[in-house]
């Protein structure tokens, strides 16, 4: 869960998180759509996430990156290109995916794929 939130806000955050998880492949996933799905205004959604310690945009981006990182780590990883994995989780371009992945995890998606493969073989 994100930072400190009231129980009412936690329920809204949980609902928003579920909606984001279900719609993560949509590159057009925006705060306005998430807010509408949860039944609150975009401003309320932004405030609740900010109060909990993260902007809604950053939360969506981090969720995309977490899903992509997991996909790069699965046994089927070599059957799907890095670009396709980025696209699958809503990144508009391979360069945007690679850049944001590297900023967060300090390695490129391809480096992560190779590292996770190496770890799999060592286990």
Regions found by a protein language model. Give the residues of each.
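A short, structure-level motif marking secondary-structure boundaries and short turns
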Residues: 1-3, 15-17, 66-68, 83-84
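Short, Lys/Arg-enriched anionic-surface-contact patches
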Residues: 3-15, 55-64
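DNA-binding recognition helix and immediately preceding turn/loop
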Residues: 12-57, 75-88, 92
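Alpha-helical DNA-contacting segments of helix-turn-helix folds
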Residues: 49-67, 71-72, 100-118
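Sequence-specific DNA-binding recognition helix
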Residues: 75-115
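Intrinsically disordered, low-complexity protein-interaction/activation regions
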Residues: 121-123
């Amino acid at each position: 869960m994100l930072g400190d939130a009231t129980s009412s806000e936690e329920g809204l955050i949980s609902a928003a998180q579920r909606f984001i998880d279900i719609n993560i492949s949509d590159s057009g996933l925006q705060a306005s759509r998430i807010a509408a799905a949860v039944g609150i205004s975009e401003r309320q959604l932004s405030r609740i996430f900010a109060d909990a310690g993260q902007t809604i945009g950053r939360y969506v981006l981090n969720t995309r990156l977490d899903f992509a990182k997991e996909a790069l780590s699965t046994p089927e990883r070599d059957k799907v290109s890095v670009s396709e994995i980025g696209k699958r989780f809503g990144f508009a371009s391979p360069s945007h995916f690679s850049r944001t992945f590297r900023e967060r995890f300090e390695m490129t998606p391809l480096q992560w794929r190779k590292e996770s493969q190496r770890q799999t073989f060592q286990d």
